[in-house]
Amino acid sequence: MHFIPEKLDDYVVMHSEEEPELLKQLTRETHQKILQPRMLSGHYQGRVLSMISKLVNPKNILEIGTYTGYSALCLAEGMQKSGELHTIDINEELYDFQRKYFDKSIYGNQIHLRT
């Protein structure tokens, strides 16, 4: 099911940055193991979040609603080297899943997860 015209979707695909391998793995595992995988930010939204973060180059980021951590990892891409990302989620059952992917990334020590 397409929510935007197929030609527009094709254009976005052709002109978007490649999705990092870690995020591809996170997407795959989210769809395999987690309820409501459509809540995942996804490739294109993630690249937009990454681009905005790189433009702003924040020292601190607060994210409310972590889900499986996709958007947090995208936002972390533009964070200053000494920066911190604090992400808060109500679902404590996802903590281990989120932490696993944060720790696989180069931002693991900078991402602080609260439930």
What are these regions, as identified by a protein language model?
Residues 43-115:
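S-adenosylmethionine/decaboxylated-SAM
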Residues 1-20:
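N-terminal auxiliary segments of SAM/dcSAM-dependent transferases
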Residues 26:
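Beta-strand-loop-alpha "switch" segments that mediate conformational coupling across diverse proteins
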Residues 17-18, 34-47:
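Conserved SAM-binding loop and adjacent beta-strand
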Residues 17-20, 35, 58, 84:
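Alpha-helix boundary/capping and short turn/kink residues
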